[in-house]
């Protein structure tokens, strides 16, 4: 059986990333795919990117990565990430724009005879030229909604991120939200392992404990703009919309 590791939305959480990557290698994953969003929210985006490169992870473009490439360091409507925060993170990533610009929006793999698309989220038809390349995030996805959203996709399954919350939905295709590696309230770094041979594929979710206290300290020591707020909103979920 061959194996592919899939992670998503690391968002500068080096503490989570540095435990999940060696675990995926230990489990025999010959390829690891990150489905977008290295940048913003967490305190160590640059260090995360360097570690992803060390492990030869295939990085796909997320909306925050795209913001960095296009230097869109302003607060956006409906976003909880401030201009000050984005400016700080983008400054920490200085010199890496060209590498981030090389991230593809999606890749496909044939696993067990099935075509799988990996991406950050469902793309607009004109995603390469659109003002915003991804369709609006659906907070309450269903098979019917995803079937409509992904109707033009020629594939059997889609693995994606963006919402940070894992889900597994079977409609006309298989829809799998990988969930964020560590952008949640649990002190666990999470990932998916896809196993396949010539005729079949399946997948399992894995979780590895990581040092959440270390992350929390880096986000609240006063260095990261809005770090305490972002910790409460994106990780602890003690602040709601």
Label the predicted regions.
Residues 168-241:
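Acidic, His/Gly-rich catalytic cores of divalent-metal-dependent hydrolytic chemistry
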Residues 55-109, 114, 136-152:
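Active-site neighborhood of divalent metal-dependent phosphoester bond hydrolases
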Residues 1-55, 226-227:
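N-terminal active-site segment of His-dependent metallophosphoesterases
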Residues 130-169, 173-175:
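Anionic-ligand binding region
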Residues 7-8, 32-37, 58-63, 119, ...:
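Active-site neighborhood of phospho(di)ester-bond hydrolases with catalytic His/Asp-centered motifs
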Residues 24-28, 111-112, 152-154, 198:
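Glycine-rich phosphate-binding loop signature in dinucleotide/nucleotide-binding domains
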Residues 1-5, 108-117, 171-174, 198-202:
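Beta-strand-turn-beta hairpins that frame and shape the catalytic cleft
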Residues 11-16, 40-43, 64-70, 124-125, ...:
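Active-site environment of divalent metal-dependent phosphoester hydrolases
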């Amino acid at each position: 059986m061959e194996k592919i590791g899939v992670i998503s939305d690391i968002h500068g959480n080096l503490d989570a990333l540095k435990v999940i990557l060696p675990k995926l290698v230990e489990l025999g994953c010959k390829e690891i795919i990150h489905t977008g969003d290295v940048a913003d929210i967490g305190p160590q985006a640059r260090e995360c990117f360097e570690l992803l490169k060390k492990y030869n992870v295939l990085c796909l473009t997320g909306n925050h990565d795209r913001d960095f490439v296009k230097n869109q360091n302003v607060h956006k409507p409906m976003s909880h990430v401030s201009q000050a925060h984005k400016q700080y993170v983008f400054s920490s990533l200085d010199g890496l724009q060209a590498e981030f610009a090389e991230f593809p929006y999606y890749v496909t793999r044939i696993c067990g005879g099935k075509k799988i698309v990996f991406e950050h989220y469902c793309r607009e038809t004109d995603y390469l030229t659109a003002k915003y390349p991804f369709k609006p995030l659906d907070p309450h996805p269903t098979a019917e909604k995803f079937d409509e959203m992904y109707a033009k996709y020629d594939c059997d399954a889609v693995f994606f991120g963006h919402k940070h919350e894992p889900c597994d939905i079977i409609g006309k295709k298989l829809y799998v939200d990988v969930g964020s590696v560590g952008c949640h309230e649990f002190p666990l770094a999470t990932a998916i392992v896809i196993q396949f041979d010539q005729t079949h594929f399946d997948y399992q979710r894995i979780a590895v404990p990581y040092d959440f206290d270390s992350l929390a300290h880096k986000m609240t020591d006063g260095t990261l703009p809005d770090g305490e707020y972002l910790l409460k909103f994106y990780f602890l979920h003690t602040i709601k919309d």
